[in-house]
Amino acid sequence: IRKKDAPSLYKNSSGNSVTQRPSSFLKNYINGSFDGGFNIEWVLDTQGNPLKYTINQTMMRVDLPESLSPNEIFKFKIKWWYNINNRLEYGGRSGYEYFEGDGNKVYTIAQFFPRLCVYNDVEGWQNYQFWGNGEFALEFGDYQVNITVPSDHIMEATGTLQNPKEVLTKVEYKRFVASKSSFEKPIIIVDQDEVKLKESAFSKKKSTW
């Protein structure tokens, strides 16, 4: 919905939100230069063959080489990217916040990958566009996710961390293990002093969580 040609920018509504910052209003409706939205580079099957696809605003249809029967499985790969917005200027659940004092940024990343639309026995595919002020109809599923960030970053996410020894220091890992059996008193895995030390490092190395 953040692409320059997104239909959500021109939808009819009851008026401008009274909580919107003046700077946000100018950037979103007057002189906005930020171009968001997913950029799809390719869609391939597991053999590396390109699959035909059609992008319709906030949705995409992938054409399978053969019909998919109930309980059958089809695997494919998508390469995509998008620009991360300044959350304070453009709002939303996802984005970054910049701190002028030390040059650091905090990233809050949401809705960052393509999701499968719901298919049910009543309506078939749920193919309503996403307008930015509602919620998705989603299928549930299990995900295996690798997230690579600079080594001085601290990752916070849902799910179960698979490689704590690789991304945490020895002290942090010890606290991580202890936290699994401490239910009355929370254990801080990375304390405030350690956070400040990491913030000043600006590591050029990367870690994958």
Predicted features along the sequence, with ranges:
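Ligand-binding face of N-terminal immunoglobulin V-set domains in extracellular IgSF glycoproteins
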Residues: 1-4, 19-21
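Short Pro-Gly-centered flexible turn/kink motifs
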Residues: 69-79
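Active-site-surrounding "flap" and adjacent substrate/cofactor-binding loops of secreted or lumenal enzymes
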Residues: 5-13
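Short strand-edge motifs at loop-to-beta-strand transitions and within beta-strands
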Residues: 58-62, 74
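Extended, low-hydrophobicity, Ser/Thr/Pro/Gly-biased non-transmembrane segments
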Residues: 12-46, 52-54, 79-209
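Second-shell loop/turn segments in exported
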Residues: 29-30, 61-67
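Surface-exposed coil/turn segments at beta-strand junctions on protein surfaces, enriched
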Residues: 55-57, 69-71, 138
